[in-house]
Amino acid sequence: MTTPKGVLDFIAGVTWDDLPQEVRQQSKLCLLDLIGVGAGGAGTKLSRIIRDYSALDMSGALPMMFDGRGASAAGVALAGGMTIDALDGHDGFNPAKGHAGCGLLPALYGLAQDLNHVSGQEFLLCLTLGYELACRTALAQHASVAEYHTSGAWVAVAVAGVAARLMRLDGNQTAHAMGIAEYHGPRSQMMRCIDHPTMLKDGSGWGAMCGVSAARLAAAGFTGAPALTLGTDHW
């Protein structure tokens, strides 16, 4: 796959020391905010249903956030993303028209448990990297269509990127992971859920699940079309 090398080098090579102090502090604040909103969301019917589903149909040994029952890494991402999204009180980025963190945190939480080599510093770095990837992907996707679509569409691509880094995939595999995630991500019409409020919310949990699954598929040799974000116009 032909991809701007600088983007992939950035995903694989950025370090904690590269981040300005104010960015490091903001990443910690975002983490605390996501945990707090998720703790509140865990009491909702939406969260209970999705956690029950993940435990049943996406079973594994990794404890889900705010639950403790086991699920796969993708299941942890799905359940946690929808739980944080349940109250719609988490951080946002206006140009992106949505929320990055609610899908990133549970995806990282599941992967960190599964891989068992992720330090706290690397976790925070990948959370920060995920915000950068997610917001750039949002701008790329929104520019490509007139319809306002869900955060899960672009969170999926960001999760795939940080998952690829944590899984130590090479540049080609990373590009495929992000391409798979964009193709499979929930690029749903957001206004339908605003006009008719339901438990679908912003698609963030489904996007997180897609991102984790995409990285797993790419690691196995599955191929995907190039993600819009990887175009030079967005870097």
Model-derived segments and spans:
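N-terminal core-entry segment
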Residues: 1-235
